[in-house]
């Protein structure tokens, strides 16, 4: 098996959080270039199984070329379809753990043709699955100024969102906005450069999240996980920005918080509504990892188990 240059963030911590059983069945919801998947396979015995999802055909093609392990099943699909696929495979409530790495992989960022990067010029696409949906260029040309501003503010926490949207529409009066560097240039005229952060970071993040409906897909798969996991099954989720982390945090808290106790004494056990999850905490990358891989500095790992 051949790895490319992509470094999986918090590899040992996220896999350790799964508490892997050698004969267990696990899901890697975001295969990418297979770093976490290989880590899971390394801990599984001959009877163990790993099901890996990815909606990027490049990731699936890479997996077919570089992974020959018979314990691995590849699914070309967004992870929001997990419940349907696991049901079809007869594995409902039989999964021992689900791992999600919510970051964009280095090959996606580094390939200018994908449209994720503001560092190299390419078509303004940003779709994880380039065979479906609307590209960033198409959306920016169809959306009005208010819609663009709202997306950049809501999904990017960008305070200058309205000024950016105004500049985008002004640019489009004379030009077609269709390249990454054109968009980055527009944003850079509005947002001041911060230390270690490109002015267009939040805008690109926001448009990517919106185009791919990433937060809706995350909310969907989190709810599905409650039915997919077996008792004591683990959730191990790495997020890279505050919006995703808030969704994961609130999901775990909501489902691990003890409900109000019934009135009256004595309190009978069967009348106490059981919590669905147990919150097993949050973790950050080590200083050593951050020094090797700057992407790790914003990573937050949250872990939970099913009651």
UniProtKB/Swiss-Prot annotation:
The answer to whether UniProt assigns keyword Chloroplast to this entry is: no
Q: GO cellular component annotations, sorted alphabetically?
A: cytoplasm
Which reactions is this enzyme annotated as catalysing?
cytidine(1402) in 16S rRNA + S-adenosyl-L-methionine = N(4)-methylcytidine(1402) in 16S rRNA + S-adenosyl-L-homocysteine + H(+)
Give the Pfam families listed for this entry: Methyltransf_5
One example GO MF annotation: rRNA (cytosine-N4-)-methyltransferase activity
Q: Which domain of life is it from?
A: Bacteria
Record's subcellular location = Cytoplasm
| Gene Ontology biological-process annotations | rRNA base methylation
Q: Enumerate the Gene3D superfamilies for this protein.
A: Putative methyltransferase TM0872, insert domain (1.10.150.170), Vaccinia Virus protein VP39 (3.40.50.150)
- Entry-linked InterPro entries: RsmH, SAM-dep_MeTrfase_MraW_recog, SAM-dependent_MTases_sf
EC numbers, comma separated: 2.1.1.199
Residues that bind S-adenosyl-L-methionine: 34-36, 54, 79, 101, 108
Keywords (alphabetical) are:
Cytoplasm, Methyltransferase, rRNA processing, S-adenosyl-L-methionine, Transferase
Q: Which residues form a coiled coil?
A: none
In the record, the note on similarity to other proteins reads: Belongs to the methyltransferase superfamily. RsmH family.
State its role.
Specifically methylates the N4 position of cytidine in position 1402 (C1402) of 16S rRNA.
The family database entries (NCBIfam families) matched by this protein are listed as: 16S rRNA (cytosine(1402)-N(4))-methyltransferase RsmH
Protein name according to UniProt? Ribosomal RNA small subunit methyltransferase H
What organism, scientifically named, is this protein from?
Answer: Ruthia magnifica subsp. Calyptogena magnifica
Report the gene name. rsmH
């Amino acid at each position: 098996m051949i790895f490319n240059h992509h470094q999986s963030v918090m590899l040992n911590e996220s896999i350790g959080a799964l508490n892997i059983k050698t004969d267990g069945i696990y899901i890697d919801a975001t295969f990418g270039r297979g770093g976490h998947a290989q880590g899971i396979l390394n801990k599984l015995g001959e009877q163990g199984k790993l099901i890996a999802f990815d909606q990027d055909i490049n990731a699936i093609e890479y997996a077919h070329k570089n992974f020959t392990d018979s314990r691995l099943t590849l699914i070309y699909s967004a992870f929001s379809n997990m419940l349907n696929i696991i049901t079809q495979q007869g594995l409902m409530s039989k999964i021992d753990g689900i791992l999600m790495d919510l970051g964009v992989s280095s090959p996606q960022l580094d390939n200018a043709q994908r449209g994720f990067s503001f560092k190299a010029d390419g078509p303004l696409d940003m779709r994880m699955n380039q065979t479906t949906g609307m590209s960033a260029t198409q959306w920016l040309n169809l959306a009005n100024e208010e819609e663009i501003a709202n997306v950049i503010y809501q999904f990017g926490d960008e305070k200058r969102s309205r000024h950016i949207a105004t500049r985008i529409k002004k640019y489009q009066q004379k030009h077609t906005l269709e390249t990454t560097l054109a968009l980055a240039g527009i944003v850079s005229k509005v947002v001041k450069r911060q230390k270690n952060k490109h002015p267009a970071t939040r805008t690109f993040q926001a448009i990517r999240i919106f185009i791919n409906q990433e937060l809706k897909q995350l909310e969907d798969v989190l709810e599905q996980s409650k039915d997919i996991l077996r008792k004591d099954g683990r959730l191990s989720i790495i997020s890279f920005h505050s919006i995703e982390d808030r969704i994961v945090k609130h999901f775990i808290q909501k489902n691990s918080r003890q409900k109000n106790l019934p009135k009256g004494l004595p309190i009978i056990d069967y009348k106490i509504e059981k919590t669905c999850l147990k919150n097993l905490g949050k973790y950050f990358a080590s200083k050593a990892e951050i020094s090797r891989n700057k992407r790790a500095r914003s990573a937050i790992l949250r872990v939970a188990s099913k009651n």
